Amino acid sequence: MTEKALFITDTFENLNFKKDTSILMIEEAFKKEINVFQCEINDLFVDNNDVLVNCREINSLSEDIDTEVTKIDIDLKDFKYCFMRKDPPVDEDYNNALHLLDLAKHNGAVIHNNPCALKKFNEKVFATHFPEFIPKTLISSSINKISAFFDSHKKIIIKPLDGMGGTSIYKVDDLNEDNLKIIRTMTNSEKTQIICQSFIEDVYEGDFRILIINGCLLY
């Protein structure tokens, strides 16, 4: 029997076909002759303790992919692999999906990444466990603390804790009224923590994404 893989993603209209790693993974699955299915998080459901998904099969990739393909219900245990590739924000819908995936994992489905790990670890907060490898960092909702952090570093980056893909990231090199207004908005009037980091000038030289699997570099 041909192996099946499920990719839980954003809508195809919102995927960047030039850089989204989910697209690269799907292409690799095609090369390995794995039957590929796709869904969004709202397609997951529970029926008598079984976690199923209303998903579509994908036979090829293109930016104008036909999303009107008839969907079918499949138990997550019937997939060789289930990849949770939905991007933030980590909102109520996202967390509800993780709860369902955790139940599916308990029932024997193979889920990547582990739903418990996704629930437990915010990737931006998790990075603070390794301070020697990241810029000077402040996580706070206090405008006074953020202002003091700016005074110490003169140039800082501010961004939400649940963002991704470069959205809502601001470089602050002057604590003028416009930037204070941005900070007030991002912190929801000092009710929501944001992450602030000292600005690294070398960012203009580009960066590298390093993937490590079982302690080995993935080339």
Predicted regions span which residues?
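Redox-cofactor binding/interface segments in oxidoreductases and associated redox assembly factors
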Residues: 7, 83-84, 197
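Conserved N-proximal alpha/beta basic substrate-recognition cap immediately N-terminal to
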Residues: 3, 13-139
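Extended, domain-scale alpha-helical bundle/helix-rich regions
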Residues: 9-11
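Phosphate-binding site of ATP-dependent enzymes
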Residues: 144, 151-154, 165-219
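Rossmann-like NAD(P)H-binding beta-loop-alpha module
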Residues: 132-154
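Flexible, charged surface loops at secondary-structure boundaries
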Residues: 1, 74-78, 150-152, 188
